[in-house]
Amino acid sequence: MENGRNWRNRELRQHVKVIDGTVSPTLLLKNATYLNVHTKQWLEANIWIYKDRIIYVGEKLPNQSQETEVYDCEGRFVVPGYIEPHAHPFQLANPEITAMHAAKTGTTTLVNDNLTWYLLTNKKKAFSIIDQFNKLPISMFWWSRYDSQTTLQEENHFINTNDVLDWINHPSVVQGGELTDWPSLLAGDDRLLYWIQETKRNGKPIEGHLPGASLRTLTKMKLLGISADHEAMTGKDVMNRLQLGYMVGLRYSPIRPDLPAILEELLESGLTTFDQLTFTMDGPTPYFMKDGVINTCIQIAIDKGIPLEDAYRMGSFHAAKHLRMDEELGSIAPGRIAHINILQEKENPNPIGVLAKGEWIVKETKEIDIPSIIDWSKYEINEMNIDWNLTEDDLQFSVPVGMDVVNDVIIKPYTIDSDVSFEELNEEKGEQFILLIDRKGKWRVNTIIRGFAPKLGALISSYSASGDIIIIGNSKKDIFIAWNRLKEIKGGIILVNNGEILTEIPLTLGGSLPNEPMEQMIKYDKQLKDTLQKYGFAFYDPVYSLLFLSAFHLPFFRITQKGLLDVKNRDILFPATMR
């Protein structure tokens, strides 16, 4: 299979020979009760699979040879592999461990953000990596970003017309977006509009990012080419989008676990047609997805009263159809990739068996060991080597405006009226030093942050929206300890207090991604959250809080490569200092 979705001519001829009886299937699912997503019926059938493709679904049994594995599905229920149409697989994880973890609970297709590739490597190497991902049993597709969702000093170096068009044309890229910089589109950015139109000409949909958008804005964005949006926070938000013709992703994420309430509101509103709805976890951190991905969303939908057949379609077929991939994914029918989940009960979407491209991932609840295939060093994504030093001069804080953390996503500016010239800040005011510093040591941006984790001596993270280094703390002494440790472990997240290292998470792939199993990352993630909460962190997810410190698609004030940013007006109020 080429590009994760197309078979060669000789393979197609071989598939037909299975029907003719001259070639035996590699796997037979016998006596299956399966969900036909096209008719919304549970039907009895034998399912023939040849390698990675479903060949036949019906009453007949094939000619069998010793090479045919027979699995009896009597008393079990079979549904299509689940699809996550909006994945951010880089949140304290890497795409391979995210995919393999998701597959264990039935999510066998991920459509992924490509933004981190822009920051980690060049286009040629990125394309080589995603071609390698096609060799996984999980189907891995990508979307093409139009903006960096932060303010970069060399934005055009990372995201430009040549690169965007090359991404759009790549066969593993199945949609454009997500469009976080939609205000620029409305303000007349014709380059952005050109990219969107080229994506549409390629037959690929566009994912928006439209939290809180009015009907007027939603209408304008539809006219400019946006196909779908996943930022609805209420049932009314969903209905507004549905009525305008949007595909709507219902979100259950660490900072927006809205799905249960949204489903209740939709059912109360009388909605009975769910064809334009999908599910997404929108980039869960490891601990949040410890029990799975789309299986969790389907379970919530079933528990809230969504009809079974619709709940499973929302977790599979709807996404495939929206992405123009329903000939390959999202159903149990001839010609589809053999992504199949075997359930003990219809009402329980947590599978006891998972097939991905016809390969067992889970069999009779036992996880099958699938070896890693991504050699990160081959693409020069290695440890983060820092060959420069943080100095006392870097820890000078004289800007009069600080960052007031209101919740997981909102940061407001405030006037600093404290004396912040000391080696330590008093935790009573909730203030800490904050520094965003270039990973190569060329520039820095300094101010004060209030309401993050005011009791903590130091946090340092090479994980950030721009790939630079974030430092937060109330003790300069602890900051230097954290800095030295970051250099020693060559990238990661480190917490220090009173000279003691409390927690550290190694991120050995470019300082941004881990190269450890998901089980370990789940432990790290929980440890990070628990430790920060002890030191005053009052919000849900610290990983997202770190990521969003620089994100210009959220209100109202951000720390970016260019300086402190007024998000609404896109003005740099205090520019970065060159070192």
Curated annotation (Swiss-Prot):
Coiled-coil region: none
UniProt-recorded Gene Ontology molecular function terms: adenine deaminase activity
The EC number(s) this enzyme carries: 3.5.4.2
InterPro entries documented for this protein: Adenine_deam, Adenine_deam_C, Amidohydro-rel, Metal-dep_hydrolase_composite, Metal_Hydrolase
Keyword Thylakoid: no
Reaction catalyzed: adenine + H2O + H(+) = hypoxanthine + NH4(+)
Domain of life: Bacteria
Root EC class: hydrolase
Keyword terms: Hydrolase
Biological-process GO terms, alphabetical: adenine catabolic process
Pfam families listed in its UniProt record: Adenine_deam_C, Amidohydro_1
SUPFAM superfamilies referenced in this protein's UniProt entry, alphabetically: Composite domain of metallo-dependent hydrolases, Metallo-dependent hydrolases
UniProt record similarity statement: Belongs to the metallo-dependent hydrolases superfamily. Adenine deaminase family.
The protein's name: Putative adenine deaminase OB0751
Organism this protein belongs to: Oceanobacillus iheyensis (strain DSM 14371 / CIP 107618 / JCM 11309 / KCTC 3954 / HTE831)
